[in-house]
A protein has these predicted regions:
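ATP-dependent adenylation/nucleotidyltransferase module used to activate substrates
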Residues: 2-176
Length: 177
């Protein structure tokens, strides 16, 4: 398929409006949506923390926030990575996050479940009862982000959630009830 704007090869299709976009126009589309959301939310002066898992969505959020605010004198970017304590899982993405923060010159903070709640997710999974790990993980991850954000005096925590993430959370919560 061809890009709806320039006739180059399309790399994605935006379902809700029926638009095919090439790489360049997709990047412009995402940046425009992020800028619109930021204007709507109204970011304050001070520290903006980016929740950084080391995955593609949070890395895109980090780079976009750096492009938008990296040179602002009234805003300072930090990144926060949460280590849930899952053996063999998080160390690789922590290193990816650290590498990108070093490259961009952004201060990187790692906070762990163990540090904040006293248990790793692996330990929680052994004593969880009827509820699955996902129930605890999302709540504790947000708690860790908020605690570290408060500790570094962040005024805002930016997250790289996409519509699929939001939809999945809503559906999971609906199914659990």
């Amino acid at each position: 398929m061809k890009c709806s704007k320039c006739n180059k090869k399309a790399v994605t299709f935006i379902r809700y409006n029926g638009t095919y976009l090439c790489k360049q126009h997709f990047m412009e589309y995402v940046e425009k949506r992020v800028r619109k959301d930021i204007r709507k939310q109204g970011l304050r002066k001070g520290i903006i923390a980016v929740a950084l898992s080391g995955g593609k969505d949070s890395l895109v959020a980090l780079y976009l926030m750096n492009d938008l605010f990296g040179k602002h004198k009234d805003k300072e970017l930090h990144a926060i990575t949460v280590d849930e304590g899952i053996a063999g899982y998080r160390q690789k993405t922590i290193e990816i996050a650290r590498k990108h923060c070093n490259f961009l010159g952004i201060e990187h903070h790692v906070v762990s479940f163990k540090e904040i709640i006293g248990l790793k997710l692996d330990e929680i999974s052994k004593i969880r009862g009827e509820l699955g790990e996902c129930t605890y993980c999302g709540v504790f991850r947000r708690l860790c982000l908020n605690k570290k954000g408060n500790e570094i005096n962040a005024k805002t925590i930016a997250m790289g959630h996409n519509l699929d993430d939001v939809s999945q959370s809503i559906l999971m919560n609906f199914v659990k009830k």
